[in-house]
Structures are given as C-alpha cells and as structure tokens.
C-alpha cells in the first residue's frame, strides 16, 4: 500500500504510464522488421518486439509491453501501435527483438535504444504527417549475433486538442493517477523526416556496447543522453556568465556596510501560506563599527525570488549608511522584530549590555518542518533521504534530533537563561575521522603537574589510564539515549557534535557508540510491544485481510511498514557510496589474471574444530603460490556441501576469527579499544614460528582479495599505510592512542626543554622496563625546541614500524605472492581496508532495497513484511549472524548490498518461498538465497528464523 509515483494502464494495446512533471503523449508504431538474423533450425525465426520505457539517468523501467509473435519469417510485419506518456528530457525507449522458443529461452535478435527529446510532433490539420524510419539493430554484448533493421514510426501528439483533450475528460471521471487513451490505428501519410540538427562545436555522438546513443562534451569532459543543440550550449554559457556576475554582485554587496532600519515584512498577497523559513542569527565581526543587517523575508512564491543584483539594488535604496551607529539601535530593532528575537535572544541580551560587541546579521535559511532550524530534508538521485545543515554547510544521512543543550562552561558570552535549541546529531562512523581528544588546558598549561603528565605518558605509551587534564568539569549533564553510561553529547560552536566522557573527564569528536564492536552496539533485540507511540500524524488500522497498515495523514499515504522501525538508530547507518572506489576496483579486477598452467581448483578438506592449524599446514605446503589462484573448493569433514562460493566465504570468516584472536599472540588489540587490531611486537615470545604464521596470514589475505572475499577483522590505520609503503604521520597516532597523541602534539606546539626528555623510550615487557634509544646514543641527546620534530618522527617510527618490521615483512611476503604490490597501491589506506574487510555495519534500508523475491513472494507479501520487521527488531549481532547464515560472511561490500557476489558474479540477496510452515528456513550461501516457508503468524516466523540462525551449522547440497 505504498504511495504510487507512476500508474500503468494497458488498454487495447495502449500503455500509458502517468508520470508527474512535464510530460507528453508519444505515439509509437512498430511497423516491421527487415532482414533479421536466422535463429531457427529451418532458417527462419518467430520474432516479436518488446518495448521498455525507462528513465535514462537511473535505468529505472517505467513500462513494458510487447507485440504479437509473427511465425516463421525474417521480415515480419507487426503494424501495432502503442501510446506512452513520457518526459522527453529524461525518458528513453528500448526496442528489443526476440525469437520466440517454446522449450528454451527466447533468442536475442537485436535492440534499438531511442532518445525521445527530438521526435517530431503531429500536426492536427494533417493526418499522420510523420513517416517511418529504419533503425539498425545493435548487439546487447560482444557475444550477440544480430543483423537487420527495425522500422518504426514515432511522433508526439499535439499538446492542445485532439487526443489529450479527450483523455482529460475521461480522466476527470476516473481515480486520481490513472488515464485511458483510445487506440486508433488509421492510415498515415508519408513525409520526409528532417535530419537532426548539427552538434555544437566540441561535441561528439557515440554508441555504447548496448547500442544506446550518447553525446560527449569534449569542452568540459562530460557525457549525456539527450542530443545537445546550439541553443542549449549558448544558454549554458549565458547561465555560467550570469552566475559569475551574480556571485560578484553578491560579494560586492556583502562587503558594504549597512545599518538596517525598521522594515516591516510585507504580508504575501492572496493569503498564501509562506514557505517554512526561519530566521537564525549569525555573529559577524567587522573591524571598526558594529553593523547590523536585516534582510526582508523571501516571497511565498519560489518563482518570484530576486537575484543577488536586484537584492543589492533594492537594499541600497532602502538602507541608510550611518557612521556613528551603536549597539542600542540594533537592540531596539530586534525588540521591534519579535520573530527575530525568539531565535537570537541570547545574542540580543549580550548586545544590550555590551555595546561594543558586534551584532548578529540575520539570514534566512530554508527549514523543513519538524527539523531544527537551518536543517532541510532532501533526496538524492537514488531516492535516499539526506539532511542538509545550512548552519555549517554539512550533510548527513541521519535525521537530526531536537534537544535542549545546556551550556555549563564558565565565561559564557551570554547571561540570559534562554538558550538556542541546537540539534543533537548521531552521525555514522567516518572512515577517516579518528578520535580527537580536546585538551585545551593541557596545551596552554605551564604548571608542573601538566609537564609531569606529559612526561609520564611519553615514558609509558601503553598506559591505559586517561589523563585528568583533558577537559574542564561540566556543571550540567544531558542524558541521551543509546549513549554509554556517563557519556554526554553536545554541539561545538561550529555546529559539529562532540562527546563528553564524564567517567574519565575527556572529550572526543568520535561517537562512542561506534567505538564498540558491531555485535556489542545494541545489547538486546527490540520488543514489538515496546516501540512506543506512533509519530505525530500517523494512525494504525487493520486491513480487511487482518493485516495491520499505517496511515500518514501528513503526506496522505499508506504503507505496511511500521514507521517507528524507520529510525536510523534502528535501521543502521547509511552506506556511503563511492564511485571512485568502484572504478578503481573494476580496474583492479581486470588486471588480475589467472595463470593457465594450474589445476581447475584448489581443494581443502578441514575440520571445523581445528581450522587454523589444518589451513596453515595445507596452504604453507604449497610451493608454487600461483596454485592458490585456482578456484577454491572447501569441504568440512562430515558435511555434504558443494562449494560454489558459500563454503569458501564461511572458511574465510571462521579462519579470520582464529588468526586474529589475541589468544595466539600474533595480534593484539590497540590501545583505545578491544576490537581494532595491531601486530603484537612480542609475537616471537609467544610463538617461535611466528614469522611463518605471518607469511600464512599474508597468503590468506591475498587469497581473500584475489577471490573477492572479505576478512572479518579491523586493523589500525598505520597497518594499511605500511602495506602501501606510505609515511606514517602524527595524525595517524590520534586514532590509535589519543593520549599519546596529545602528549606529542603538546611537545610540537610548546617548548619541551623543561620536560627533560631524551631521544629514548621506556618500554615495558612482562613487568620489566627497558630503555630503547631512538637513535645512537639517544639517551644522551636532550629534546629541545630545535630537534623536537625529529624526536616526534622517531617516536612514531618506533611505535608503528621498527617494533613490528619483521612481522610486517613476513606478512607482505605472503600477500605479494598472490597480488602485485604496485597494483594494490592504486588504493589509499581507507580503500584498502574496505577492499580487504568491507563494511561492518548493516544498513537494513539498503539491504531491503537490494533484495529480490521468488516463487510467489513480493515486497508487499505478508511473510516478507514480517521478515523485514523481524530483521529491524534484531540487535546488530543477530543481523550479522543472519547475514552470515545466508551469505556465508558477516561483512558487506564497500558500496552495500547492491554489490553482493554469488557463485556466478553479482547476486542480490534473495528470498524464495519454499516448504511448509512446520519447517525451519534454510540458506544457500552460494546464491545468497534464503528459503523461507510461508509462516502464518509473525511470531512463528520470528521464532523459527532465530532458531535457524542460532543453531544451524554445516552444509548439505549446493552452497
């Protein structure tokens, strides 16, 4: 019962999708085929044509119809007519010719992809003045064998009168969103079709491998589907010049000094309700005088908005320039503007008391109802909702939440009890935003306790005790849901949220909810009875078939999904799509070549309870690493699974758990958490053959990347930089050990002479402390203001490189036996992490959007609705276990579920109806398919799904 964006009505061979926006009715006549390819044994074919209307930029299909089949001919004559309502600017028609087969799949005979922007329009005074055109049939891929032509007639119906007027009369009597167009196939008169206009200078027409025509602009290196014209190019250049002039005028206007006079906003004509604009205040420092500027509110109609030049001229006439202005004039102005005072009360009070403070300038920012001031809700090209913060010009996938932020810091600029309502934002974990500990008292302090704390931290970098000098003690606490005990979230002056840990008296930019392992971020699953009330404007009702559905009276739509389960805190962070990474990955896969002189597959038969040692012996016994590039074939003892990708994915998952387990002493957790891994510098004390094991781990990592699988583990960022041979900097220390980072940063920004530091480090091993010189005779060289940068570089080199150099070399030896290191270097350290380990978070919305259904299931089927409700009610750990149960891995590819791979290439997550309600669900990991019985109640589905996920182990059949 989701809202309809397009309705489709076939009627007497007529197909009219009703699309909102600028649209026209297109008459298409499939006349005949000429000299088609021979596909049948007896030298003929049974051709028919399939017509697909789709959106060019999104490749989203809007309508699909086909002609009748003409038997045993290579020159069929269909003479069938269709009508489409299209948007000429971004719609295209795809004609595909097939040879019908009763027993096997229909053979492909060719295709034609036609843009709709330059088709002619019929003249009502003449009868069918448009003529046919023969289109060359093009192949779908390089393997397609096609020939011949497709003869078509295409023209737009006139905009006024005729067919569309009749349709508008019929449409008044019908339900909204549907339209009927009569089919009328009469004789046509031929006339010569005008050739398309010439391309502008610098443009080129090309055809892609699907036979679609596109146009290349060599001037600005862009491509597009619709044919450009000289008028488009000239208007584009005019727009660019106009935009440059507007920006210049805007800069000139902003550089002027204005004093605002008492301007009352004019009410909109006709009682129109204005757009939801809010007035926010922004402090502006201008040397010399204290100046204020009040802009008039924008008009209600978007079409009447003025340009910056007009705005500048209007304000120049209405504003007065007064050289001896003061804060009292501005204060009185704000008091006469109650709407402005509500949003800038604290600033106004400060101006009233201190005349020398600069007054705020008032700006108008578009605000979406229900969001904090300055926030706007938008949708991207893929239909995903995101939020724009006009206050600090940032965007986020997470909906901002309104909460009161109490400022308890001393020395505030305002003495008023009124405070701005600021949004509290839960942002997804950024791949390149390590933990930053704010330590203003530490940086500016000169007393001996601070110096002693810095020296203690440097002498023992692995100390887990936090420094008490990192942040002032707040006077107020604001409790927020989902945060760990003792944590608080606030907003910095630049609008960026930061987090306060009252347990250790530290602050950080990174969300503490994302510092825990994925499976620990939510302790328990949700209960359907504990979801709370529905959002404002929503209503819950029962359908005739007994199912519950929900009505949104705000937007007048209905849906099956519970809106309370669409909270980003429940669905998970959105997947950040990266087109650049996709291009690099495709290039990387093309360069990987499988040797010709190796077996068809590399087999391993293992026991689950001894997977680490058996895998080590089997892989290290291979003398020629190229053999590992053959297809992996994994078998677990006493299991009958046939490995077509799923068993291998589970092998990588299980082996990762063992290899990276700190119990074996090869890796250890980093200083800041218990899930990010780093190489253990003392691994040789735990295992004499540790270098051989690191070579084995390198081979496994290379195997995973070569075969497109993912490892289950996170490493610190310097680990990936060492793999790429990049220089490790002080900023890399920040995400690993923030306390040690703060100490080194303090040295960098201050004179360290008084600390009495030497070019040596105290290292503690098993209770004993050893002194390590950073350079020869380092214990005799003092750290001064002149050599402090060299000291910091040596500390970082020792901390991340020197101690683990042998282990890293062994790891790279195994890794480069399968993958050339030069090919890996096309990625940066962030992309290399995604290449090896993928994403750990599960975005349920992305998961649901890229799922397909078979054997009677569809998105609105009750069982499918219950399934996704059960997934949304799961905690993060159970979602990952469900993903691992169906796909064999707990990781998600870089660009989300759209890039899931199966045994034969890309394979979306699939749910197929199977079995009876008494059976448990079963999975086929090689096909990413879940066989889900048609359960009769939600409780039954949830119980049996969890039972299958938590208790199933092993393979049988094809996986």
From Swiss-Prot:
Phosphorylated; which impairs interaction with SCNN. Interaction with YWHAH inhibits dephosphorylation. Residues 624-958 form the HECT domain. Its EC number is 2.3.2.26. Activated by NDFIP1- and NDFIP2-binding. Residues 197-230, 369-402, 481-514, 532-565 form the WW domain. Pathway: Protein modification; protein ubiquitination. The modification Phosphoserine is found at residues 316, 346, 430, 432-433, 448, 459, 463, 467, 471. This is E3 ubiquitin-protein ligase NEDD4-like. It comes from Pongo abelii (Sumatran orangutan). The lineage of its organism: Eukaryota, Metazoa, Chordata, Craniata, Vertebrata. The gene is NEDD4L.
